[in-house]
Swiss-Prot record:
It comes from the Eukaryota. It is found in: Cell membrane. GO terms for molecular function: polyamine transmembrane transporter activity; symporter activity. GO terms for cellular component: endoplasmic reticulum; plasma membrane. This is Probable polyamine transporter At3g19553. Residues 454-479 are annotated as: Disordered. Keywords: Cell membrane, Membrane, Symport, Transmembrane, Transmembrane helix, Transport. InterPro entries: AA/rel_permease1, RMV1-like. It is a multi-pass membrane protein. Its main location: membrane. The chain crosses the membrane at residues 22-42, 53-73, 86-106, 130-150, 160-180, 236-256, 275-295, 304-324, 332-352, 355-375, 395-415, 420-440. One of its GO terms (biological process) is polyamine transport.
Length: 479
């Protein structure tokens, strides 16, 4: 790596060439891919909801009680703390570095689990045209090639990832616009009202809804790479909310309205390709399959960017060793990207449903901390500079966070015993990892970035944390 990489320290004054900042349009589509990527994966909501009615109502109501509150919280806190690290910095500022580290660990693990889905799903779409990919001998090398190729694209620069997200999103959404137009003559609105209460699977329904509408906060870990984040972030989040809702509702209304309600039981992952064939023919089916495959690439790129820059941000504030802050000549966090890619490869053996339930559980824990931090920072730091401020008082923001908090608790309660067990192991691992890293820092077994060379942070110094958070901060990873 030599001349291509550098690390922020007091001995090295040379820095990599600054990479171009993210502007509004690429950020909109990066957030779109963090959250959605298109209607691929929403088909299960029709099956688990017993028909179109609950699926359509879910994608109308859930954004109001979940997506919009989470987006508003993200808009205020990401602009107040415009740093790589995002929610880790928010939680540390509100509750101290111990809980900030736990938030980072849960969210990173959840994100890597989520990212492990996309190379697998990409191959699942391609195997319809290339059956050889169904065999392990071909599938494993293909999985590795895809993962390393996409990892290299991330390494080349965030602005390239942002531009790729725009191109991939346009390509992925176009076939659904065409499908909706072709479906109009055959739509019967009464079909949208069908529901078979005997076939409702509430756990599957809520997990599908939650998975397809979460991760609004992930882009906050890129805040340090955004041009004028105080103005750009709120606009990008607003645009992404509209784009996500439209990308779900329009295809669902077209497909369920144009086809008989007797097909509700057939709606599962990948069924939109069959819907396309029934509405437009084989050519539309092929287009949707290609769009689905490309969408998974966009999802992978957006998720890996957030995960890698989160590790970089945690290193910059002294939570992780300094090598996680190492940047390439393109301004990307090399070691952090490789760490996230390694996690993706190791987790790709898990099943689709297992991954969704595990990542939802860990993500839900993190969101409860974020909502609590949002309210506490309104009380604890009323004078904090907030370029964007949710126009509600403390009681109002508490009420804003109540419905989504109840929703994430419901998702956790509905989890399978296996999910509780494995998630519990991950939580205990995070609790043990924090004091271990504290010991590493005290013994100087690894170098951490000195406070005087760090970026300006919203996280308090150790003396302030001692006063604000009591004994817990005595083992702080932050000086």
């Amino acid at each position: 790596m030599g001349e291509e990489e550098t690390i922020v320290n007091d001995e090295n004054s040379s820095k990599p060439k600054p990479s171009p900042k993210l502007t509004l349009l690429p950020l909109v589509f990066l957030i779109f891919y963090e959250v959605s990527g298109g209607p691929f994966g929403v088909e299960d909501s029709v099956k688990s909801g017993g028909g179109p009615l609950l699926a359509l109502l879910g994608f109308l109501i859930f954004p109001l009680i979940w997506s919009i509150p989470e987006a508003l919280v993200t808009a205020e806190l990401a602009t107040s703390f415009p740093e790589n690290g995002g929610y880790v910095v928010w939680i540390s500022s509100a509750f101290g570095p111990f809980w900030g580290f736990q938030e980072g660990f849960w969210k990173w693990f959840s994100g890597v689990m989520d990212n492990a889905l996309y190379p697998v799903l990409f191959l699942d779409y391609l195997k319809h045209s290339f059956p050889v990919l169904d065999h392990v001998a071909a599938r494993v090398p293909a999985l590795l090639v895809i993962t390393f190729s996409l990892t290299y694209l991330n390494y080349r620069g965030l602005h390239i990832v942002g531009f790729s997200a725009v191109v991939l999103a346009v390509f992925s959404l176009c076939p659904f616009v065409v499908m909706a137009l072709l479906a109009v003559p055959n739509i019967r609105p009464k079909r949208w009202l069908f529901v078979d209460t005997q076939k409702i699977n509430w756990r599957g329904y809520f997990n599908t809804m939650f998975w397809n509408l979460n991760y609004w906060d992930k882009a906050s870990t890129l805040a340090g790479e955004v041009d004028r984040p105080g103005k750009t972030f709120p606009k990008a989040l607003f645009g992404a909310v509209l784009l996500v809702m439209g990308s779900y509702l329009i295809p669902l209304m077209a497909g369920t309205g144009a086809l008989s309600s007797s097909t509700s039981g057939e709606w599962s992952d990948g069924y939109f390709a069959e819907v396309g064939m029934l509405i437009g023919g084989v050519w539309l089916k092929g287009w949707i399959q290609a769009a689905a495959a490309m969408s998974n690439l966009g999802l992978f790129e957006a998720e890996m960017s957030s995960d890698a820059f989160q590790l970089l941000g945690m290193s910059e504030i002294g939570m992780l060793p300094a090598f996680f802050a190492q940047r390439s000549k393109y301004g990307t966090p090399t070691i952090s990207i490789l760490c996230s890619a390694t996690g993706v490869i190791f987790l790709s053996w898990m099943s689709f449903q297992e991954i969704i339930e595990f990542l939802n559980f860990l993500y839900a824990l993190g969101m409860l901390l974020e909502f609590a931090a949002f309210v506490k920072l309104r009380i604890k730091k009323p004078d904090l500079h907030r370029p964007y401020r949710v126009p509600l008082n403390t009681f109002g923001v508490s009420m804003l966070c109540l419905p989504p908090s109840l929703l994430v608790i419901l998702v956790m309660v509905l989890a399978a015993p296996k999910t509780f067990l494995i998630s519990g192991v991950i939580i205990v691992l995070g609790f043990c990892l924090y004091p271990f890293l504290t010991l590493v820092k005290e013994k100087q077994w690894a170098r951490f970035i000195p406070e005087e060379t760090r970026p300006v942070s919203g996280v308090s110094s150790e003396s302030q944390l001692d006063e604000e958070h009591g004994d817990e901060s005595a083992a702080s990873l932050l000086p």
